[in-house]
């Protein structure tokens, strides 16, 4: 069973309080999501493999550490996942970015795929699927299904907030996927919105309704 990591870092929790706040405007909301995305990526990549390399400083030669093993790819779920991407790239500028487009059927609440664009060597990379919210779990499950069908094996999921129902369903559907969350909220309401949540992340990021 994949592990669930809930971050308690003070900076993440501080910024998340403003992301949740209904009075936070679009510009500040975008900036905060971007910043938290970067901070979360720092934690998500904590266990990447390192190798010894010989370098020369201005003073002497030494053995230093550099990343080795599988390369990274981040896959935001459109459209809201895009809001976390720039912060991630600030931290990991060489990472590849794929995209999975999904929308939620308002009646069935099931995720419907409409777009997929991934790096050609996706099966050789460590994948981090990115979406601000894990509500019912349907979008995350379908996105990971799509990645696995195309050969991806090493997959993690990263989100700002999650409902317990979504975490449970994602774990049941993909036992091999670790889940990284800035905050685990109370529940889903009758309309499948996370409570207390932050509203519709996509609408708040892009100024739409």
Curated annotation (Swiss-Prot):
Q: Which GO terms describe its molecular function?
A: GTP binding; magnesium ion binding; uracil phosphoribosyltransferase activity
- Named cofactor requirement(s): Mg(2+)
Task: Tell me the superkingdom of the source.
Answer: Bacteria
- Give the record's GO biological process terms: UMP salvage; uracil salvage
Query: Can you state which reaction this protein catalyses?
Result: UMP + diphosphate = 5-phospho-alpha-D-ribose 1-diphosphate + uracil
Enzyme class, UniProt record, top EC level: transferase
Q: Relay the activity regulation note.
A: Allosterically activated by GTP.
Q: According to the record, how does the cofactor bind? A: Binds 1 Mg(2+) ion per subunit. The magnesium is bound as Mg-PRPP.
Residues that hold 5-phospho-alpha-D-ribose 1-diphosphate according to the record: 79, 104, 131-139, 200
Q: List, alphabetically, the InterPro entries matched.
A: PRibTrfase_dom, PRTase-like, Upp_B, UPRTase/APRTase, Ura_phspho_trans
Which residues make up the binding site for uracil? 194, 199-201
Question: SUPFAM superfamilies, from UniProt?
Answer: PRTase-like
| Annotated pathway | Pyrimidine metabolism; UMP biosynthesis via salvage pathway; UMP from uracil: step 1/1
EC assignment: the record states 2.4.2.9
**UniProt keyword annotations, A-Z:** Allosteric enzyme, Glycosyltransferase, GTP-binding, Magnesium, Nucleotide-binding, Transferase
As for family, the record states: Belongs to the UPRTase family.
> What job does the chain carry out?
Catalyzes the conversion of uracil and 5-phospho-alpha-D-ribose 1-diphosphate (PRPP) to UMP and diphosphate.
For this entry, the protein name equals Uracil phosphoribosyltransferase
């Amino acid at each position: 069973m994949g592990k669930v990591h809930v971050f308690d870092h003070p900076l993440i929790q501080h910024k998340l309080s403003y992301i949740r706040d209904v009075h936070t405007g679009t510009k500040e909301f975008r900036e905060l999501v971007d910043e938290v995305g970067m901070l979360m990526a720092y934690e998500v990549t904590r266990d990447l493999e390192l190798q010894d390399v010989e370098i020369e400083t201005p003073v002497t030669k030494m053995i230093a550490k550099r990343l080795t093993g599988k390369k990274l790819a981040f896959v935001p779920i459109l459209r809201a996942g895009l809001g976390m991407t720039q912060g991630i790239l600030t931290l990991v500028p060489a990472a590849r970015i794929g995209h999975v487009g999904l929308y939620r059927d308002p009646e069935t609440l099931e995720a419907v795929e409409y777009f997929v664009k991934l790096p050609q060597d996706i099966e050789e990379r460590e994948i981090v699927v990115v979406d601000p919210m894990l509500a019912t779990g349907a979008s995350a499950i379908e996105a990971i299904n799509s990645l696995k069908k195309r050969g991806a094996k090493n997959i993690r999921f990263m989100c700002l907030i999650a409902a317990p129902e979504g975490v449970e369903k994602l774990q049941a559907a993909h036992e091999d996927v670790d889940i990284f969350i800035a905050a685990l909220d109370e529940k889903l309401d009758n309309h499948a919105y996370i409570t207390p949540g932050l509203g519709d992340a996509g609408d708040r990021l892009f100024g739409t309704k």
